[in-house]
Amino acid sequence: MSKSTAEIRQAFLDFFHSKGHQVVASSSLVPHNDPTLLFTNAGMNQFKDVFLGLDKRNYSRATTSQRCVRAGGKHNDLENVGYTARHHTFFEMLGNFSFGDYFKHDAIQFAWELLTSEKWFALPKERLWVTVYESDDEAYEIWEKEVGIPRERIIRIGDNKGAPYASDNFWQMGDTGPCGPCTEIFYDHGDHIWGGPPGSPEEDGDRYIEIWNIVFMQFNRQADGTMEPLPKPSVDTGMGLERIAAVLQHVNSNYDIDLFRTLIQAVAKVTGATDLSNKSLRVIADHIRSCAFLIADGVMPSNENRGYVLRRIIRRAVRHGNMLGAKETFFYKLVGPLIDVMGSAGEDLKRQQAQVEQVLKTEEEQFARTLERGLALLDEELAKLSGDTLDGETAFRLYDTYGFPVDLTADVCRERNIKVDEAGFEAAMEEQRRRAREASGFGADYNAMIRVDSASEFKGYDHLELNGKVTALFVDGKAVDAINAGQEAVVVLDQTPFYAESGGQVGDKGELKGANFSFAVEDTQKYGQAIGHIGKLAAGSLKVGDAVQADVDEARRARIRLNHSATHLMHAALRQVLGTHVSQKGSLVNDKVLRFDFSHNEAMKPEEIRAVEDLVNAQIRRNLPIETNIMDLEAAKAKGAMALFGEKYDERVRVLSMGDFSTELCGGTHASRTGDIGLFRIISESGTAAGVRRIEAVTGEGAIATVHADSERLSEVAHLLKGDSNNLADKVRSVLERTRQLEKELQQLKEQAAAQESANLSSKAIDVNGVKLLVSELSGVEPKMLRTMVDDLKNQLGSTIIVLATVAEGKVSLIAGVSKDVTDRVKAGELIGMVAQQVGGKGGGRPDMAQAGGTDAAALPAALASVKGWVSAKLQ
């Protein structure tokens, strides 16, 4: 009996654990502190800083099953998903990694043992082929002489992409930085499937399938293209879980493995589909994986960046559901079946199931409305069309803005004997792809990044003042031996009380000083295991090896500590008041305010905000002890400690507890007891994205200051109303009622004046071919009164065409009215458009009534003068 996908995942991890590898959990799909990458798309992403020498781990071997998304940016598989055997938006990458530990020999031997040993995957050796980089004789000889693969199944691949080192078998992180040759392992499905071995003209067939890529990072590529050997060569490997599952389960398509068969059946059930071979079922089964895990990792549908990619995937899935005949929202119903089929890899998703389902349902409902708006826009564009072809830009705008598939656009056009410029659509699509490619991938010059080999010991939990030694200095990213007065720099110390920005808490400010120098610290950041003090040397000079006294700005740190502790209390209070679906999606803690983003699908009610505020202040009055304990990550999770969104954790973590009320993983600085916070006040609650709310709050002196400010405002209002704070509401109600009465009286007077003006105007109408034409610019008339005047004039004049204009604050307001018996010859929308164009504006409306605005008041007299000639031509 073949292994299930879940069993294959576990077997891979178990094998490498038996070889001394640390099993590391999958990182978030949102790359941590990496603006160069749209989504996590490979197992090595979370170890990138380790490979670059910017970070150190307490292990030199690691293995993972990493969740990955490739949709948008350089790795955009979206269009092919569902229509090929192996394209996915979401996949799991099995990997083993060596950070300066073992190299080619062990990496190849490990791979061969796992794949062919009867104890593990037991693949037939004769079905395995390998490729190596053309000049990598070492890897070639290991495969041939040690593993024993015949020469005819070892293929050398050269620079097959048009440039030196541009090869399928040479991996590069970017234009500069770590790189090296790779060896790939292929599985031969047999001669009943078309295709040739790698490097042959038939290599794109499905017979020979790459299952494992083993990268040997042994060079550091310089800006001039030269390759310098790395002092500690490393290994990075990747094997797609879905691909190896297909091989081990004896199927040719990833969509035929147990995981996808189960999901496809679930899709068929919720959509009512009966043909299990329909490609749309595969599309939806793939897309629920990427969408659900992206939302669980904090991405929300939006019109930009990661949220935009998520929205496109959701809409593609929903459209395919509609093609299958789904009559109601269905996509969110697949989250439960997905959790079931993912096994242990779905635990994070299970904790957020309700939130993920709600976001998907809301987005699907919104798309239904978007589809209607897209159809309306298409109708407008077709109405304006003069030829028989809809331009590609418009078709692309319908697709890009409204999620409108081009084939649906073509169907609507076909009914009206109109073609779609599909070549123009493809050109616009390719331009978008080009922009996406430029905006993604490892494009940075990593040799310009700060590399610190030393580590800094943080002692800021217990000290705000400490003596240390300068271990490194950096100016403009480059290491220097000394700096002089006036220079901006990053100073690294062997030990420091300064907290480096992390977990939402900003870095400390303060001063580094000595007998003859003073360095003002404006920020503190992490550089791998080192802590960098960023600022400017105010006086003297400073060199590597100097002793310094590090003084943190104590008052600022104290305010930050209160805000950070209050953030933890508020998080726990939100979960009590709103529900356990609340999870942190981001935070900012500085000395002035705390900002907290969390999952919740609607605006908080005033009574909910008050309840959270009251609950936090109750815990402050309890004066609970705030305690920290260092423990294993798994033990902390078992204790119920909540983790911060987007934060990386070591195997040993710091657990912060506030009595029995809150327990979270946190490396930040905090008050000693909750009572130190003094007072907590929420100052705003707003939405940042679908399903994400944001609270801003203040504590301590900041909270007291808001109380004083509110009191002063109330006193000022009371003084203006000649009352006091006790009867202020009654006074305001009285003033509002009097204001409403006066506004009503004023409106009546305006309407009377407009009626009188209309009566005066009617006498100015002229006859044009039996139709009364009235064109007039009015002064002192509000734009909103023009419509009333046109209605009055229509009643007075009978068969008529009316154009009225007024200018207020430099802006032109126009209205055109046409009696219904004339609309077959003159349409108000066309007339107003002609006038508006001359005054720098645009507008539209019904055939009998249309409005417009403009910005060029000086051009108004000439524009109005042109009406008579235009109307005369229409009435001939």
Curated annotation (Swiss-Prot):
It is found in: Cytoplasm. Zn(2+) binds at H564, H568, C666, H670. InterPro entries: aa-tRNA-synth_II/BPL/LPL, Ala-tRNA-lgiase_IIc, Ala-tRNA-ligase_IIc_anticod-bd, Ala-tRNA-synth_IIc_core, Ala-tRNA-synth_IIc_N, Ala-tRNA_ligase, Ala_tRNA_ligase_euk/bac, DHHA1_dom. The modification N6-acetyllysine is found at K74. Consists of three domains; the N-terminal catalytic domain, the editing domain and the C-terminal C-Ala domain. The editing domain removes incorrectly charged amino acids, while the C-Ala domain, along with tRNA(Ala), serves as a bridge to cooperatively bring together the editing and aminoacylation centers thus stimulating deacylation of misacylated tRNAs. GO terms for biological process: alanyl-tRNA aminoacylation; negative regulation of DNA-templated transcription. SUPFAM superfamilies: Class II aaRS and biotin synthetases (SSF55681), Putative anticodon-binding domain of alanyl-tRNA synthetase (AlaRS) (SSF101353), ThrRS/AlaRS common domain (SSF55186), Translation proteins (SSF50447). Homotetramer. It catalyses: tRNA(Ala) + L-alanine + ATP = L-alanyl-tRNA(Ala) + AMP + diphosphate. Keywords: Acetylation, Aminoacyl-tRNA synthetase, ATP-binding, Cytoplasm, Ligase, Metal-binding, Nucleotide-binding, Protein biosynthesis, RNA-binding, tRNA-binding, Zinc. This is Alanine--tRNA ligase. Catalyzes the attachment of alanine to tRNA(Ala) in a two-step reaction: alanine is first activated by ATP to form Ala-AMP and then transferred to the acceptor end of tRNA(Ala). Also edits incorrectly charged Ser-tRNA(Ala) and Gly-tRNA(Ala) via its editing domain. Its cofactor is Zn(2+). Binds 1 zinc ion per subunit.
